[in-house]
UniProtKB/Swiss-Prot annotation:
Function: Serine/threonine protein kinase involved in the cytoplasm to vacuole transport (Cvt) and found to be essential in autophagy, where it is required for the formation of autophagosomes. Involved in the clearance of protein aggregates which cannot be efficiently cleared by the proteasome. Required for selective autophagic degradation of the nucleus (nucleophagy) as well as for mitophagy which contributes to regulate mitochondrial quantity and quality by eliminating the mitochondria to a basal level to fulfill cellular energy requirements and preventing excess ROS production.
PANTHER family found in the cross-reference section: NON-SPECIFIC SERINE_THREONINE PROTEIN KINASE, SERINE/THREONINE-PROTEIN KINASE UNC-51-RELATED
Main location: cytoplasm
Subunit details: Homodimer. Forms a ternary complex with ATG13 and ATG17.
Polar residues bias locations: 380-389, 406-420, 473-490, 497-508
Pfam families registered for this protein in UniProt: ATG1-like_MIT1, ATG1-like_MIT2, Pkinase
Protein's recorded name: Serine/threonine-protein kinase ATG1
UniProt KW keywords: ATP-binding, Autophagy, Cytoplasm, Kinase, Membrane, Nucleotide-binding, Protein transport, Serine/threonine-protein kinase, Transferase, Transport
Annotated source species: Debaryomyces hansenii (strain ATCC 36239 / CBS 767 / BCRC 21394 / JCM 1990 / NBRC 0083 / IGC 2968) (Yeast)
Gene3D superfamilies: Phosphorylase Kinase, domain 1, Transferase(Phosphotransferase) domain 1
Length: 875
């Protein structure tokens, strides 16, 4: 086998041009351990799919065994309705499985995207014109359902004869190929169904096992939404588990959604048990009785009551001939080499789906920052040494915080029923319509603030020269190379940022925003966060060109403690909440937390009587901005957890099996609505805190005109340029304020776009709910869950207390003490955010009793944090 000499461990598509005789094409699929590429044989010019499995990710014996079994099974699988293994290659870093290329994607994609594909894909257009879905139905035409069923059964019967159980039957593993060109070719190939329709093939045998009919297995595997209840109960099971999965897939083909849905395994099993074998079909789906009967026989809770394989294989729907048109579909304009997603036209910037595909979790961005960027961006990234050091990425610490928040997150349904821990729920119960109006009103207010936020940030940015924004106040003693020169200005004023003339204009794509934040953050942004970190946490943390693990960060901070007297403007840090050594001066005063010598020295220095009156004012403003920024950042991470639940998440953990990545692919509209409502109010809360910070910055900025030019004779000049004689403290504080303002602006715009995405998702969920049978989605229309208005304050309060409780339990058993410290710190900031209310919104303001209770919890958690910090110092 001949390959190029360079091969990446994570993404062969960026470095390897060929694998043997196969030329590597674009990526068409991705899982936890493997990436699928569209390739073609350079000798025959035939398209193939290559599944490349990264060796380094197969860290357990079980994973290697799964791959070996999949390969051994596929080598013996020669069936027209099973994806064939054409070739197999190995390198030092990858296993490459060369397989049949199925250009029409998977069944799940076909069901979900057919309304878009009908406009652009010639075969699907012809297919759905001939066999349209019933009016008002989200499912497929009866003929298509039975056609695909026949082909699926043909493959299962073949597996059954070989004593194989697939264990992961789901729409994502049922791939589609274009119809064959003639009826004779169809017969010669041994296919079943209608010759003129697309072909279905079973794929992904990673969980398959040789399991004789008398044997039982007990491994939890497969996709939760299609798992048999005996697997969900962790009981032993046999091949009949596949029959349940077939029933679930068949139901989805007829109705357009899985028969049972939930946000976790436990709730899914409860929903299945609650149904008591009563499978309901929406009237709009117009499912024929014969199909209903078959589906119900497959979806029997008790495996012994489930239809047998013999009965299933001999069902009249399967054995009887299916009458078709016997005329070929329109294929003249189809290019069989194009993958199905390539037929969907570019998405308009106004459509929400622009946000979905490019979104990745911060961890994924961290792992893929180099290989996933276009070549020109990679080279830019490599050449910008300062930026590279800056991009130590907030993901390491932020992702840990998100994990802590998510770990303590009840499901969307559960969270509605949690008592508010004595936090009053005055006016929380409203009609859905009123709730939507309130969400819309809050969102519109935030949208309007975007103009003001960007305007003041632009004015500050242009006051000096980019990153040097208030440069005229600099003195020689305060010079810093990182602020000088045009390069930093160019980095800061990169094209993806809003210009002064378009401060209120939205970015055309979320992709640009993610790249600008995660890949090429500005020097000013990093400086701002680093400076804020110094004040907030009392530690001078030096930057790192790589995203070190938390333990490494803590060690580095301990080492750098001796260097704490360095000027704060020389520090770089990746995020406001990046240091668990939580010692914000504001909280020190309130909670009487222990302070290190470093913090004490910094505090004494910062409050030195040598500071000019202007410096004292600037320092006060900086303190307020840093406090608001940190509170906003904590709530933003909570909101990001909700955001990540609504988008297709790329694999972020080697421990995740591929099937688990599809849990959120098709969440029930009711769950989507619940998550979206929570996400919107959390982002609105974040935005209100950030906007409040910008108001403070605006007042400070315009007060400079009055200070420097009371007579207002030179109001058109930058007042700071008239203060060249100010000392270095004045200059340093002003620059730090400006940098923090730019960070707030960037975070504000990012949150606004995410809130917009969630708002559109919420609208879509509401539309689906209004169109569906109320008994299917809404349950009891008088239920509290359907009337409860989502309030950010309650969500934040509940989550902060849950985090601190779990941290206390872990602390008692001496488990993950660093994580406990981070959980306590984050919980305190979240509760502090509750006390920082929006003066313009009286409806959700806490009364005095509630405020006193929140403050009590802050003190209580702060005391726990104080005790824990002393423990860690001893350790």
């Amino acid at each position: 086998m001949s390959t190029t000499s360079i091969e990446s461990n994570n993404d062969i598509g960026r470095s390897v041009k060929t694998i043997g005789v196969y030329s590597i094409g674009p990526e068409i699929g991705k899982g936890s351990f493997a990436t699928v590429y569209k390739c073609f044989n350079t000798k025959t010019n035939e398209s193939v799919a290559i599944k490349s499995v990264v060796r380094s990710k197969l860290k357990s014996k079980k994973l290697v065994e799964n791959l070996e079994i999949e390969i051994s099974i596929l080598k013996t699988m020669k069936h027209p309705h099973i994806v064939g293994l054409l070739d197999y290659k190995q390198t030092t870093s990858h296993f490459h499985l060369v397989m049949d290329y199925c250009s029409m994607g998977d069944l799940s994609y076909f069901i979900r995207k057919r309304n878009q594909l009908i406009k652009t894909h010639p075969v699907i257009s012809s297919l759905l014109e001939r066999y349209p879905s019933p009016e008002g139905s989200h499912g497929l035409n009866e003929v298509l359902v039975i056609h695909f069923l026949k082909q699926l059964v043909s493959a299962l019967e073949f597996l059954r004869n070989k004593s194989l159980v697939h264990r992961d039957i789901k729409p994502q593993n049922l791939l589609l190929c274009p119809p064959l060109h003639s009826k004779q070719e169809f017969k010669d190939g041994g296919f079943v169904g209608l010759w003129e329709l697309p072909l279905l093939k079973i794929a992904d045998f990673g969980f398959a096992r040789f399991l004789p009919s008398t044997s039982m297995a007990e491994t939890l595997c497969g996709s939760p939404l299609y798992m048999a209840p005996e697997i969900l109960r962790y009981e032993k099971y046999n091949a009949k588990a596949d029959l349940w999965s077939v029933g679930a897939v068949l139901y989805e083909m007829t109705v357009g959604k899985p028969p049972f849905r939930a946000d976790n395994h436990v709730q899914l099993l409860k929903n299945i048990e609650k149904s008591n074998d009563r499978i309901k079909f929406p009237s709009a789906a117009q499912v024929p009785e014969s199909l209903k009967r078959l589906i119900r026989s497959l979806l029997k809770y008790n495996p012994t009551e489930r239809v047998s394989f013999n009965e299933f294989f001999n069902d009249p729907l399967i054995v009887n001939d299916l009458e078709g048109n016997d005329e070929p579909l329109e294929t003249s304009e189809m290019d069989e080499n194009l993958f199905i997603s390539e037929y969907i036209s570019p998405i308009k910037s106004s459509q929400k789906s622009q946000y979905i595909e490019p979104i990745t979790t911060e961890v994924a961005v961290k792992e893929k920052s180099k290989q996933d960027l276009p070549a020109r961006e990679v080279s830019t990234h490599a050449s910008e040494s300062q930026t590279k050091a800056v991009d130590t990425r907030p993901s390491s610490r932020d992702e840990e915080i998100k994990e802590i928040i998510n770990k303590n997150s009840p499901g969307p349904e559960t969270s509605r029923s949690i008592q508010p821990h004595n936090l009053k729920e005055k006016s929380l119960v409203l009609k859905n319509k009123d709730n939507d109006i309130i969400l819309e009103r809050d969102y519109v207010v935030v949208e309007k603030r975007a103009v003001e936020v960007n305007a003041i940030a632009d004015e500050l940015a242009h006051a000096g020269s980019g990153a040097v924004a208030i440069n005229p106040r600099r003195t020689s003693s305060g010079s810093d190379n990182s602020y000088n020169g045009p390069n930093n200005m160019q980095l800061y004023r990169r094209p993806s940022l809003r210009s002064n003339s378009s401060g209120s204009q939205r970015r055309p794509s979320f992709t640009d925003r993610r790249i600008s934040i995660s890949i090429s953050p500005t020097n000013a942004l990093t400086k701002a966060i680093g400076l804020a970190s110094n004040r907030l946490f009392g530690v001078n943390a030096s930057g790192s060109p790589t995203n070190r693990l938390i333990e490494e960060t803590d060690e580095r901070l301990a080492i750098n403690e001796n260097n704490s007297s360095m000027n704060a403007t020389n520090n770089t840090f990746s995020t406001i909440l990046s240091n668990p050594n939580f010692a914000n001066n504001l909280l020190i005063q309130k909670l009487n937390l222990p302070t290190s010598a470093t913090v004490a020295n910094n505090s004494q220095t910062n409050t030195s009587p040598q500071l000019s009156p202007q410096s004292k004012t600037d320092e006060s403003v900086l303190n307020r901005l840093e406090s608001l920024a940190t509170k906003a950042h904590a709530i933003n991470l909570f909101a990001d957890v909700k955001f990540s639940q609504l988008i297709p998440s790329p694999p972020s953990s080697d421990a995740l099996d591929d099937d688990l990545l599809h849990q959120n692919d098709m969440l029930p509209p009711k769950i989507v609505k619940s998550i979206s409502e929570e996400g919107v109010v959390l982002y609105v809360k974040t935005l209100s805190l950030l906007a409040k910070g910008m108001v403070i910055a605006s007042d400070w900025w315009y007060s400079q005109f009055e200070i420097d030019d009371p007579s207002n004779k030179n109001s058109n000049e930058n007042p700071l340029k008239q203060s060249s004689n100010n000392n270095s403290d004045d200059l340093s504080l002003a620059v730090r304020i400006n940098e923090l303002v730019q960070w707030i602006r960037e975070k504000f715009n990012e949150c606004l776009e995410k809130a917009e995405f969630i708002r559109l998702t919420l609208q879509e969920a509401n539309t689906l709910l209004s169109n569906e049978d109320s008994s299917e989605y809404m349950g009891n229309s008088n239920s509290v869950a359907d009337k409860t208005r989502v309030v950010a304050e309650k969500l934040i309060f509940d989550r902060a207390l849950e985090m601190s409780r779990n941290a206390a339990v872990n602390e008692l058993v001496k488990e993950d003490l660093k994580g406990c410290e981070l959980a306590y710190s984050t919980a305190i900031w979240m509760l502090e955010a509750l006390l920082d209310e929006d003066s313009s919104n009286d409806e959700d303001r806490l009364d005095d009793e509630d405020k006193a209770m929140v403050e009590k919890f802050i003190v209580s958690i702060g005391n726990r944090l104080s005790v824990l910090k002393r423990k860690l110092e001893v350790v």
